[in-house]
Amino acid sequence: MIRHGSNKLKIFILSILLLTLSGCALKSSSNSEKEWHIVPVSKDYFSIPNDLLWSFNTTNKSINVYSKCISGKAVYSFNAGKFMGNFNVKEVDGCFMDAQKIAIDKLFSMLKDGVVLKGNKINDTILIEKDGEVKLKLIRGI
C-alpha cells in the first residue's frame, strides 16, 4: 500500500529518471561552461536577438544569459520536474527594439514559471517546453 507522503519521493525519482533518460545536458561535465545559442521555435520568441547566448554552470547551479545588450544571471532549480530560474538582469538602455524587449521579457517570465527541458546528447540540443509545446531550442556551440 502506498501512502500519500511518498508522492514527493515518487515525483523526485521520476524527475531524476526523466532527466537521465532524456540525456539532459545539465549533467556535470567539462562541457558545462560552453555557450548555448538560443533558437526560437515558437513565434512568441522569433524576435529574440541572434547574439543572445546561454551558459550553464552545473557546479553552482547558475545560468548566465548575455548579448551585447543584456546580461543576466540566475540560480536554477528543479521543482516537480520543471526547470526554474529567476534572473537578475542588466540591460543597455535603448539597445533593444520593442519586439526584442517583449520576447526577452517573455523568455525570463517563462523561465521563472518553470519549463521542461528535453536533451539530446547526439546533436547537443536542449528543447525548452512550456505547456507541452516546444518554445525554444538551445544548441551548443554553433
From Swiss-Prot:
Classification via CDD domains: lipocalin_MxiM
PROSITE patterns membership: PROKAR_LIPOPROTEIN
Reported consequences of knocking out the gene: Inactivation of the gene blocks the Ipa invasin secretory pathway and severely attenuates virulence.
Pfam families, per the entry: MxiM
Membrane topology: Lipid-anchor
Predominant location category: membrane
CC annotations in GO: cell outer membrane
Record's subunit section: Monomer. Interacts with the secretin MxiD/SctC.
Protein's name in the database: Type 3 secretion system pilotin
Native species: Shigella flexneri
